[in-house]
């Protein structure tokens, strides 16, 4: 059924973990005739990324409050009210039938403005621990979804919306069927890279010796330094890039992934069907570690928390994984995947606007 006159405003920004899932839901609704517009901030990645996907974007001025000085905190109430008023102006101009909050600072003012105007709010929490913005918005949202158990007590667990090129990868047993020789390791630290991975992996690869290939996504402005670190460690064959444009192709190539455990990364690893060693980013609420827990528990992944990370420990963990174990991990990852989150969230939006 087509919904040619229906409009959605997506509210998401800051990181790919918020923006890419929002784009996946938007694409589902566009295929059913919906018009999509975005609410974001002008100085974060959505400003450049969203228009590349053919979606117009409006901007508000808003920043986070965590870790700010006293003057910022004193000004915060006025800045929040101003951001809500800015969001309200954009909502009045666009007149959406619903708004979708995917997290990031922009979701708070946008969601409150929509609620005050009587526009239905649908919320999706990507992490196993709900962010402050989504904790607030969950109290006023018409529907709330979570990617992993634990963010909310009674919200449906639907996984994270994942890009279709990742979902459509061949099954692990097909990809691994003809592989022999060097084990392929893919290192990913997110769009900004991960300093701890950049510092540790060259020494790990040197210690592993022959029998391994590596592709390493170093992050913004780190490619040269990381490439030089591999060369200094005697690892001449490392392929180091700043950013990976075709993530699906990289997952398809890999036998093993070594990475952070941001929400979208964990969901993509599972959807792709690749075994992983997660090195969670250190945070007081252990958000990234909790994101990865379910894949570790089912045997699809291993985890080393950052305080426990050493060259020796990671080297030993990689050495212990042979091809049979890597295939088993990949299969368990794919079996644990929830592949229809974008469809479930899109259908909920359609249902509340009928």
Curated annotation (Swiss-Prot):
It catalyses: di-trans,octa-cis-undecaprenyl diphospho-N-acetyl-alpha-D-muramoyl-L-alanyl-D-glutamyl-meso-2,6-diaminopimeloyl-D-alanyl-D-alanine + UDP-N-acetyl-alpha-D-glucosamine = di-trans,octa-cis-undecaprenyl diphospho-[N-acetyl-alpha-D-glucosaminyl-(1->4)]-N-acetyl-alpha-D-muramoyl-L-alanyl-D-glutamyl-meso-2,6-diaminopimeloyl-D-alanyl-D-alanine + UDP + H(+). Pathway: Cell wall biogenesis; peptidoglycan biosynthesis. It is a peripheral membrane protein. One of its GO terms (biological process) is peptidoglycan biosynthetic process. Pfam families: Glyco_tran_28_C, Glyco_transf_28. Keywords: Cell cycle, Cell division, Cell inner membrane, Cell membrane, Cell shape, Cell wall biogenesis/degradation, Glycosyltransferase, Membrane, Peptidoglycan synthesis, Transferase. One of its GO terms (molecular function) is UDP-N-acetyl-D-glucosamine:N-acetylmuramoyl-L-alanyl-D-glutamyl-meso-2,6-diaminopimelyl-D-alanyl-D-alanine-diphosphoundecaprenol 4-beta-N-acetylglucosaminlytransferase activity. The keyword Ribosomal protein does not apply. UDP-N-acetyl-alpha-D-glucosamine binds at residues 15-17, 127, 163, 191, 244, 263-268, 288. It is an enzyme of class 2 (transferase). InterPro entries: GlcNAc_MurG, Glyco_trans_28_C, GlycoTrans_28_N. It is found in: Cell inner membrane. Its EC number is 2.4.1.227. Disulfide bonds: none annotated. Belongs to the glycosyltransferase 28 family. MurG subfamily. Cell wall formation. Catalyzes the transfer of a GlcNAc subunit on undecaprenyl-pyrophosphoryl-MurNAc-pentapeptide (lipid intermediate I) to form undecaprenyl-pyrophosphoryl-MurNAc-(pentapeptide)GlcNAc (lipid intermediate II). PANTHER family: GLYCOSYLTRANSFERASE (PTHR21015:SF22), UDP-N-ACETYLGLUCOSAMINE--N-ACETYLMURAMYL-(PENTAPEPTIDE) PYROPHOSPHORYL-UNDECAPRENOL N-ACETYLGLUCOSAMINE TRANSFERASE 1 (PTHR21015). This is UDP-N-acetylglucosamine--N-acetylmuramyl-(pentapeptide) pyrophosphoryl-undecaprenol N-acetylglucosamine transferase. The gene is murG.
């Amino acid at each position: 059924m087509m919904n040619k006159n229906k409009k959605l405003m997506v509210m998401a920004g800051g990181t790919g973990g918020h923006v890419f899932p929002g784009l996946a839901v938007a694409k589902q609704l566009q295929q059913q005739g919906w018009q999509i517009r975005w609410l974001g901030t002008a100085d974060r990645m959505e400003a450049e990324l969203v228009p590349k996907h053919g979606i117009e974007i409006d901007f508000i001025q808003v920043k986070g409050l965590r870790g700010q000085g006293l003057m910022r905190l004193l000004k915060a109430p006025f800045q929040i009210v101003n951001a809500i008023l800015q969001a309200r102006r954009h909502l009045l101009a666009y007149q959406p039938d619903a708004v979708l909050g995917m997290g990031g600072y922009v979701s708070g003012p946008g969601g409150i403005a929509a609620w005050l105007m009587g526009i239905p709010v649908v919320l999706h929490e990507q992490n196993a621990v709900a962010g402050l913005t989504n904790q607030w918005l969950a109290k006023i949202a018409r529907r709330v979804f979570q990617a992993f158990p634990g963010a909310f007590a009674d919200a449906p667990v639907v996984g994270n919306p994942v890009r279709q090129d990742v979902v459509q990868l061949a099954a692990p047993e097909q990809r691994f069927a003809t592989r022999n020789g060097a084990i392929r390791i893919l290192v990913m630290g997110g769009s900004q890279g991960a300093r701890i991975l950049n510092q540790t992996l060259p020494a790990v690869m040197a210690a592993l010796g022959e029998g391994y290939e590596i592709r390493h996504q170093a992050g913004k402005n780190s490619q040269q330094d990381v490439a030089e670190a591999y060369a200094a460690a005697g690892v001449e064959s490392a392929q180091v890039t700043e950013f990976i444009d075709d993530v699906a192709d990289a997952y398809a190539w890999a036998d093993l992934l070594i990475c952070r455990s941001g929400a979208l990364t964990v969901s993509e690893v599972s959807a792709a069907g690749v075994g992983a060693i997660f090195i969670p980013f250190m945070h007081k609420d252990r958000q990234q570690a909790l994101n990865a827990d379910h894949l570790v528990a089912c045997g699809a992944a291993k985890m080393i928390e950052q305080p426990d990370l050493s060259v020796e420990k990671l080297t030993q963990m990689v050495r212990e994984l042979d091809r049979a174990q890597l295939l088993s991990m990949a299969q368990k990852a794919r079996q644990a995947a929830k592949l229809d989150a974008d469809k479930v969230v899109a259908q909920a939006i359609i249902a509340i606007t009928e």
